[in-house]
Amino acid sequence: MAKISILPKDDRTNGWSAILPKRPITPALKGTQHADWVVIGAGFAGLAAARRLGQNRPNDKVILIEAHEVGEGASGRNSGFAIDLPHNVGSSLQELEGSHRFIRLSRAAIKYHEDAVAAGNIQCNWAERGKYHAA
């Protein structure tokens, strides 16, 4: 099997990772592997897919492959805020209806994540702080 030698450049400027304790090095996958599912990439989408497969197919073997560190790329460089209000609500009836749909969807997404944190007993300092929007 060929070894991959060309990987995306990592400029090591992820500020969030810089404030975390050093993570243990995970050994490279070796030998022949057998899995029902292989997820490539451990960013938001890959982690969500692997987690969901584990929930929906608990007897299946899932392998998650990441070239670098989990959540270290673009997924780990966001601000991590979840807000339920759009930045610009608008003033027309159509814009207000769209904003209400957005608010319902956003609140459902926040609730989904809150439930996942509680169910997984994830220690992440989850806190509802509201939103301040000042001029």
Give the predicted meaning of each segment.
Residues 54-77:
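Glycine-rich FAD pyrophosphate-binding loop
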Residues 37, 41-47, 67:
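Glycine-rich Rossmann-fold phosphate-binding loop(s) that bind the pyrophosphate
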Residues 83-135:
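Dinucleotide-binding Rossmann-like beta1-alpha1 core, especially the glycine-rich loop
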Residues 36, 75-90:
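Short coil-to-beta-strand
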Residues 71-79, 120-125:
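Short, flexible active-site-proximal loops enriched in glycine and acidic residues
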Residues 34, 59, 76, 128-129:
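A structure-centric signal for secondary-structure junctions around beta-strands
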Residues 1-37, 55-61:
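Extreme N-terminal leader/targeting segments of oxidoreductases
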